[in-house]
Amino acid sequence: MNWITNYVRPRINSMLGRRDVPDNLWIKCPETGEMVFHKDLEENKWVVPASGYHMKMPAKARLADLFDGGKYEAFAQPKVAQDPLKFRDSKKYSDRLKDSRTKTEQEDTIVAGLGTVEGLKLVAVVHEFNFMGGSLGIAAGEAIVKAFERAIAEKCPLVMFPASGGARMQEGILSLMQLPRTTVAVDLLKEAGLPYIVVLTNPTTGGVTASYAMLGDLHIAEPGAEICFAGKRVIEQTIREKLPEGFQTSEYLLEHGMVDMVVKRHDIPATLARTLKILTKQPATVVGANDDKTLSVIEASRAVSA
């Protein structure tokens, strides 16, 4: 009997314990293939330091980054019917919901809150893409409507950060009903004379693009975001033609007049604050080329609305 094997090694193992190493310590940049340590990525707002590629940012992290001091009032998730169609494909919809809730520690895809950005009060609504692809269902639609109602009650602007694959197929027509519901909510905010700004993130597609994501007074997009109704591959297979390089990206849509500005993630809070202060006729510090561009975009929007 080997006393080292049978006695010493088990004792050492029991004292030290077995460490489970997370499988997401290093994250690969989709653009360059560079491996980035997850802490470095988080500290840089989920933007790859070398390439500048904008990764998907968790919804709660985005709200904390947006609001002054990371402080805001988080809105409660409205209570709605769960799995009303008792839907099942390769897996029960109810099980998919449970898995997404465990993964994201959220009730559904929408996270919303009230706070200040450079002292300006606003409501922000963010999609969590990791919750079933940020898809729009009954719970998400209700959360969005409630957020608009809160903005109207507070008499403050609303900023939307969509990141979605579109309507949630597991809820069928009940999901599609959220398109007109959210559109009406946007109209009510505008009737109240309050600004509505959309910050388009990667990806913004499907029914979300066909409704509240493209109804803003101003549309800002993050660099390289895919913004479309149907995806490039689907269109190419339908028309049997190759689409232009960069088709449906933020930069392509800016060039063709579909979005107003492409703004890097680090600059979004300041850009929103300046823009909203101008729209709400509050004093705003305007310096530099980016601010001049913001002013020109706002003036152009006013001219179109007039």
Curated annotation (Swiss-Prot):
UniProt key word Lipid biosynthesis: yes
Listed Pfam families: Carboxyl_trans
UniProt keyword list: ATP-binding, Cytoplasm, Fatty acid biosynthesis, Fatty acid metabolism, Lipid biosynthesis, Lipid metabolism, Nucleotide-binding, Transferase
BP GO terms, sorted: fatty acid biosynthetic process; malonyl-CoA biosynthetic process
Keyword Glycosyltransferase attributed: no
PROSITE patterns: COA_CT_NTER
A GO term for molecular function: acetyl-CoA carboxylase activity
Reaction it catalyzes: N(6)-carboxybiotinyl-L-lysyl-[protein] + acetyl-CoA = N(6)-biotinyl-L-lysyl-[protein] + malonyl-CoA
Family designation: Belongs to the AccD/PCCB family.
Protein name: Acetyl-coenzyme A carboxylase carboxyl transferase subunit beta
GN (gene name): accD
